[in-house]
Amino acid sequence: MRLIQPIFASYSTRDTGLGEDNKIFNAWKEVNERVKKDMDLGVKEFLLFYIPEYKLGEKADTHRGNEGIDSHKFDQVCVTAASLARDIQPQCRLIVDVCLCSYTQDGHCCIVGDQEKTDKLLAMSARDIYTASGATVAPSDCQDNTVKNIRATKGGGIDIMSYSTKFRSTFYRGWRNAMKIAKGIHRPYQLDVHDREGAINRSIKYSNDGANELMVKPGITSLDLIKPIKEATGKPCGAYQTSGEWLGIGAPGSLEETYHIFKRAGADYMITYGARRLARHHRQ
């Protein structure tokens, strides 16, 4: 089972609440250094989250809202993320998260009420990141058309890791704090935890749309879905150990225990904030 380490990057360094190892790094000064250290430990894959300096359309003296979001400004942010991806891509496998939630002021993964604009921005983001860096793109937005549109835009060359079975969950709280995303939002496009059949079918849909790899999230509450998803699609499926899961790990040996549980469930990869810690442990 492969280990994937999330990396947070922005214009400045600050704490995430997810531990010193998972702080937000300065995109231009510290990310390369952190990646090199992790690779020395044995980590070979990284999931990049890019946090813009400002929400799109946001100004210090204006009310919050998404009225100011436009394709040109969004494209500039995506190019910045792609430039960072290009700098570290030759050293490792880099996966770049694709979503709108860190850019929109209301914290939604879409432009509410404007599906056409949502589809355009997400496809443009993936296109620019891939064109500039060759990185794998990981759409996490849970919109119906994203994977299909990315595949149509860039054809067979682009590698897509889809957050294909992603539930509405309380286990995301630490990540949303780190990304400065508004709390208390109901996201109907994310799956209901009660809906097993719908969860499996969502991964089948994204597989048919052209995703290369699939995912369940949160990890520990979705492990029962990995085997049926893999059997239905014939594609790799991994699990994301979310920030809430990570923050709940405290006892000695508990991280290693969850690693073996994910592996036992058949996960092809595990995204975890403790990837570097696990890699260090395995080397010892």
Go through the PLM ranges and name each one:
Residues R2-I4, S10-Q284:
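Alpha/beta enzyme core
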